[in-house]
Design a protein with these regions (language model features):
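Sec-dependent signal peptide recognition
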Residues: 22-28
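Hydrophobic core
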Residues: 32-36
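Cleavable N-terminal signal peptides
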Residues: 30-31, 42
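Basic polycationic patches enriched in arginine
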Residues: 14-17
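Active-site-adjacent loops and short helices of periplasmic peptidoglycan-processing enzymes
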Residues: 5, 40-206
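Domain-terminus/edge residues, biased toward the C-terminal soluble/receptor-binding domains
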Residues: 171, 175, 186-189, 193-404
Length: 404
């Protein structure tokens, strides 16, 4: 079967600024910077000797990145593009409530698409579910175009929707010109960071894994509704399925040396889910070797540590118009995922520009967590109670306005 990835798995083991500082003694080796709502590893990161030119590993429950190399470098994503294709498709399908057993006819344009593909001809039909299966499992380029044409009228219109979604997600280093990644255009690019954000959304919404976890699947080709003509076996391009504990996704990519071998992987072990991205590995299976190394690291000595609990007071600030301080409490538990070998934590409550009145539960700032003076995590602060502007300040404002 034709594919855009080849080879077999090698033998590998598996930021008005008010602040308050508090000290926490704990051990932690991973320190991070904050970008796009994620937190990133910034010190004591081991050299994993990875082959990809851009790599990233994150824990998905708290969007915490624990390993990174050139994660913001723009790269040609090749077939990894298809995770945005599927994410955009799910948005449309869910919005329009389209049944997954809907039949989709293959156009002449879709039928002639080259590269990784399924054997299907003009006028033949597949269900929507089968098209998505072919895209995710088998990386089928022609299925991607057929899906795009069905949902948006043309690939070009569908790609516009992909880029709109990227903009809405805040992906400033991502742009698409193709729905399947079958392009070498310098206007088609993304980063490991942006790709991780797309993949994370797919994981959180839950649809992708029921496709990406499948190693083999038969789909039926029809010459008309309820008129089957043959079966096609889909074989996953993900060589780690069944070979590495907990792996259940999600997408490979390759377009020659320009893209290198790419892979977005995810695995869940004992309730912890990790997400990895490798872009630009030049040797065959380098994308999978990188994934194994990152997963081994992330599942190694790491554990969860709760530093502070939900509703715990984390800082206070004075606001013009009241003698009372605005007190910030945690909206959620403050949890860190790390390997805790060394270090010291401190917290800094950074308040937004506040104006009265303030309502109980209103977001008023962010609590940053530091380790060795580097940001390792962040949490939202909300007001512990209502704070109103005192009558004396209201009266002073009115008197002032009389003379202005």
């Amino acid at each position: 079967m034709q594919s855009d990835e080849f080879g077999y798995l090698q033998n590998e083991n598996r930021r008005n600024r008010y602040f308050v500082m508090k000290k926490y003694t704990a051990v932690f080796a991973a320190l991070m910077i904050i970008v796009n709502g994620f937190t990133f590893d910034a010190f004591a990161q081991p050299d994993l000797n990875l082959e990809g030119s851009s790599t990233l590993l994150m824990e998905t429950r708290h969007d915490q990145i624990i390993y990174r190399e050139n994660e913001d470098k723009r790269r040609l994503p090749a077939s990894v593009t298809k995770i945005m294709t599927v994410a955009t498709a799910f948005d449309i399908i869910n919005e329009k409530n389209i049944p997954m057993d809907t039949f989709v006819s293959i156009s002449e344009n879709a039928a002639k698409i080259k590269g990784a593909r399924i054997k299907v001809f003009k006028g033949e039909m597949l269900t929507l579910d089968s098209l998505i299966s072919a895209i995710v499992i088998n990386s089928a380029n022609n299925a991607s175009v057929a899906l795009a044409e069905y949902l948006a009228g043309s690939e070009a219109e569908f790609v516009k929707l992909m880029n709109i979604k990227a903009d809405e997600m805040g992906l400033k280093d991502t742009n698409f010109v193709s729905c399947n990644g079958l392009t070498l255009s310098n206007r088609h690019y993304s980063t490991a960071l942006d790709i991780a954000q797309i993949a994370l959304e797919l994981i959180e919404e839950g649809d992708i894994l029921r496709y990406s976890s499948i190693k083999e699947k038969d789909i039926i080709i029809y010459k008309g509704p309820e008129m089957p003509v043959r079966r096609i076996k889909l074989e996953s391009t993900n060589r780690l399925l069944g070979e590495y504990e907990g792996i259940d996704g999600m997408k490979t990519g390759w377009m020659g040396p320009e893209s290198g071998y790419c892979f977005v992987g995810t695995a869940q072990v004992d309730g912890t889910r990790l997400l990895s991205v490798t872009l630009g590995a030049q040797e065959k299976d380098g994308n999978f070797r990188d994934t194994v190394k990152m997963m081994d690291y992330g599942f190694g000595d790491f554990r969860y540590l709760t530093l502070m609990e939900k509703n715990q007071e984390a800082g206070s600030a004075r606001v013009e118009g009241s003698f009372r301080k605005v007190r910030g409490i945690l909206k959620d538990d403050l949890v860190i995922y790390g390997n805790f070998e060394e270090g010291e934590y401190s917290t800094e409550a950074v308040f937004d520009e506040l104006e009265l009145p303030i309502k109980e539960g209103q977001k008023i700032g962010t609590l940053y967590v530091y380790g060795k003076d580097k940001i390792v995590h962040q949490a939202e602060l909300v007001s512990k109670s209502d704070v109103s502007r005192l009558w004396i300040f209201v009266l002073a404002d009115r008197i002032k306005s009389l003379f202005s």
